[in-house]
Amino acid sequence: MAKAAKTIKLEQTGSAIRRHHSQRSTLIGLKLNKIGRTSELPDTPAVRGMIEKVHHLVRIVDEK
């Protein structure tokens, strides 16, 4: 059997208002658009890079 893919659960903690367009686009790419929303994404280098780009606006809730 194949291993289950690792996932990261994120929560948006900061607003995208008055942020650069690239940071807003990154939040949309992470499936986040409002404070308090959560999304579960695969743990890949691309997703980790996106999280690092907006680390001041999101927090990692859970890593599986």
Curated annotation (Swiss-Prot):
Alphabetically ordered keywords of this record: Ribonucleoprotein, Ribosomal protein
Gene Ontology MF terms in the entry: structural constituent of ribosome
Superkingdom, taxonomy of origin: Bacteria
SUPFAM superfamilies the UniProt entry points to: Ribosomal protein L30p/L7e
One Gene Ontology term, aspect cellular component: cytosolic large ribosomal subunit
One Pfam family matching this protein: Ribosomal_L30
One of the GO BP terms on file: translation
Keyword Nucleotide-binding annotated: no
Xref: InterPro entries: Ribo_uL30_ferredoxin-like_sf (IPR036919), Ribosomal_uL30_bac-type (IPR005996), Ribosomal_uL30_ferredoxin-like (IPR016082)
Subunit structure: Part of the 50S ribosomal subunit.
Family recorded in the similarity comment: Belongs to the universal ribosomal protein uL30 family.
Protein name: Large ribosomal subunit protein uL30
